[in-house]
Amino acid sequence: MKDERLTPHPDTECLTGANKCRVYFNKSTKEVEGTTIYEADYVEVDALTREDVIVAIIRTKYSLNKELGIRREYINNQQGAAEKWNGFCLFVEEAQSIANNLNL
């Protein structure tokens, strides 16, 4: 089954006083009776460090087990592993870019 969460959404919200940050993904809009409703999944990060935000974004698409499986396949030069690894790396770069924009 293909994972439709291709990229994290760049919207983030830092919750002042709570030392938390929300990173939104799968953002969409829909019209209900003439009103636009915004929907999004999000992950909440307990600490406001750059690394915590990056890992939280990565986990919106890749569980730790899935990430380790991709790494293992790549290390063992399995067929199709390079493509999966490149996709993972691109997602990590996008996560890093989002975290950098937060100026944490």
Language-model features: locations:
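A preference for well-ordered globular domain cores
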Residues: 2-104
